[in-house]
Amino acid sequence: MCLAIPVQVKELLPDNMAKVTLDGVSKIVSTALVDDVKVGDYVVLHVGYALAKIDPEEAERTLALIRERAMGDAA
C-alpha cells in the first residue's frame, strides 16, 4: 500500500525543490509536478515528490486522521 501525506512548504529552493515539514521533521522534495507552489502551501507528498496542492483545512483533517490511526495502532 502506498501513502501520500500532506506536508507544509517552508522554503522554496532552486530547481523546483522545496523544504517541507511534518511534525517538526524537514525534508527536501521536488515540486516539479505542481504549478505555482508558495511558502505556506500544503502539498501531498509521495516518495519525495509533491503531487498536488491541498487546502490547509483538508491537510489538517487528513493529518489528524493519520495521527489518530497511528495512536490507535500503538495502544
From Swiss-Prot:
Name the encoding gene, please.
Answer: hypC
> What organism is this sequence from?
Rhizobium leguminosarum bv. viciae
The UniProt similarity line reads:
Belongs to the HupF/HypC family.
* Associated pathway: Protein modification; [NiFe] hydrogenase maturation
Which PROSITE patterns did the record assign?
HUPF_HYPC
Q: What does this protein do?
A: Involved in the maturation of [NiFe] hydrogenases. Involved in the biosynthesis of the Fe(CN)(2)CO cofactor.
GO biological process per UniProt? protein maturation
| Protein name as it appears in the record | Hydrogenase maturation factor HypC
InterPro entries associated with the record: Hydgase_assmbl_chp_CS, Hydrogenase_HupF/HypC
Q: A Gene Ontology molecular-function term?
A: iron ion binding
